[in-house]
A protein has these predicted regions:
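ABC ATPase "signature
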Residues: 181-182
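Helix N-cap at the start of a conserved alpha-helix in ABC-type nucleotide-binding domains
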Residues: 133-135
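A short, surface-exposed alpha-helical micro-motif characterized by mixed small hydrophobic
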Residues: 163-165
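Catalytic Walker B motif of ABC-type/P-loop ATPase nucleotide-binding domains
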Residues: 122-125
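H-loop/switch region of ABC-family ATPase nucleotide-binding domains
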Residues: 157-158
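Conserved signature/switch motifs of ABC ATPase nucleotide-binding domains
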Residues: 96-99, 117, 149
Length: 206
């Protein structure tokens, strides 16, 4: 609860500020972040495309020109949704419903949905933990592609080799506290803390 979170030099959270933010301020701050859950959390009643466009459609209703230009605005959002889904390899699944998809495909929809709002930071909460090993690769491939495009991401993961390959910085948590922080090379090859060494030895012995 202490410290600050800054995005593009703007303070979006300050633990020392006791002021209660308004709902509008909270919503505005949340737009800096996109969140991809480990359990997908897609809307089962909507198609893949609708899952991706829904949030932006709801936000568009707040635009002063929405009533006047409704069709054009919604068409633009639909086109954007189609492009984002194509970028994660799901252009053939836009009219499907979540239950018709594999777990890996559902997670790629969740990634596309988060990308629709063009967040400054994309946050992943164990994005592969609910997937079979065979499906993990397709999700990691999408995340690796985002890293290649210099997308800023915070990834909670137990995929150690992937974290080592794709990260600029690695943060190792132990019992909710930061145990070690550094470059992938430093943390994985030359850990400073005994706890980090113990964890890595046990992991790579498996």
């Amino acid at each position: 609860t202490s410290g600050q979170i800054r995005v593009n030099e703007k303070v979006v959270f300050d633990g020392a500020d006791a002021r209660t933010l308004s709902e509008a301020e909270i919503r505005k701050n949340r737009l800096h972040f996109g969140l991809v859950f480990q359990s997908f959390n897609l809307f089962p009643q909507y198609t893949v495309l609708k899952n991706c466009t829904l949030a932006k459609e709801l936000m568009a209703k707040e635009r002063p020109d929405f009533k006047t230009n409704k069709k054009q605005i919604l068409d633009e959002i639909k086109t954007e949704g189609e492009a984002v889904l194509a970028s994660v390899g799901l252009q053939e699944k836009m009219d499907y419903y979540p239950h018709q998809l594999s777990g890996g495909q559902q997670q790629r929809v969740a990634i596309a949905r988060a990308l629709m709002l063009q967040p400054d930071i994309l946050c992943f909460d164990e994005p592969t933990s609910a997937l079979d090993p065979e499906l993990t690769g397709e999700v990691l491939k999408v995340i690796r592609g985002l890293a290649d495009k210099k997308t800023t991401m915070v990834i909670v993961t137990h995929e150690m080799q992937f974290a080592r390959d794709v990260s600029d910085k690695v943060l190792f948590l132990d019992k909710g506290m930061v145990a070690e922080y550094g470059s992938p090379e430093q943390v994985f090859e030359h850990p400073k803390e005994e706890r980090t060494r113990q964890f890595l030895e046990r992991y790579f012995e498996q």
